[in-house]
UniProtKB/Swiss-Prot annotation:
Keywords: Cytoplasm, Protein biosynthesis
Main function: Responsible for the release of ribosomes from messenger RNA at the termination of protein biosynthesis. May increase the efficiency of translation by recycling ribosomes from one round of translation to another.
Keyword match Protein biosynthesis: yes
Subcellular location(s) per record: Cytoplasm
GO biological process per UniProt: cytoplasmic translational termination
One Gene Ontology cellular component annotation held by this UniProt entry: cytosol
NCBIfam families: frr
Stated name of the protein: Ribosome-recycling factor
One Pfam family this sequence matches: RRF
Family: Belongs to the RRF family.
Main location: cytoplasm
Single annotated GO MF: ribosomal large subunit binding
Region named Disordered: 136-161
Source species of the chain: Rhizorhabdus wittichii (strain DSM 6014 / CCUG 31198 / JCM 15750 / NBRC 105917 / EY 4224 / RW1) (Sphingomonas wittichii)
Length: 185
């Protein structure tokens, strides 16, 4: 059975792009986004769990997040988790609701976040190139085993390269859009 599997390569490359998009949603841009709190985990009942399993997060205003905690006894741990998440947010406790004003980003912080977005994009590019290398290696293996001919290998290598180029362009587009959003240009 041939080692080359185009569908697997596509799935893995798509996974790298999705991982990048997930990483980028966690970067604060100065506007309220419910995704901003996705990386926050809360210690409740002796276990760590994502914030969205203990509360409902909404963005009632462009510069305000609201976190409605389901169990009153968990308000303290949720407040602590948000403050210690490294997002620079300071919740205001109002009963079972935490109101989180989104502060303006300083120019220096914007540049740091843009640089971080670039690092995430480079990590995704490396992942895509690693998938490409795996695909090329499996094609060479198939040719050595005699399962495909040289012409077939070259044609499929061209397919893999086109897939790689398209995926890298998706990565670049996602990173450029996030950098533009962060820098406010």
């Amino acid at each position: 059975m041939p080692a080359y599997d185009k569908a697997d390569l596509e799935r893995r490359m798509h996974g790298a792009v999705e991982a990048l998009k997930s990483d980028l949603t966690g970067l604060r841009t100065g506007r309220a986004s419910v995704n901003l709190l996705d990386p926050v985990t809360v210690e409740i009942y002796g276990a760590h769990m994502p914030l969205n399993q203990a509360a409902t997060v909404t963005a009632p205003e462009p510069r305000m997040l609201s976190v409605q905690v389901w169990d009153r006894s968990n308000v303290g741990p949720v407040d602590k988790a948000i403050r210690s998440a490294g997002l620079g947010l300071n919740p205001i406790v109002d009963g079972q609701t935490l109101r989180i004003p989104i502060p303006d980003l300083t120019e220096e912080r914007r540049k740091e976040l843009a640089k971080l977005a670039s690092q995430y994009a480079e990590k995704a590019r490396v992942a895509v190139r690693n998938v490409r290398r795996d695909g090329m290696d499996s094609l060479k293996t198939d040719e050595k085993k005699g399962e495909i001919g040289e012409d077939d290998r070259k044609r499929r290598e061209t397919e893999v390269q086109k897939l790689t180029d398209a995926t890298i362009s998706d990565v670049d587009a996602a990173a450029a859009a996030k950098e533009k959003e962060i820098l406010g240009k």
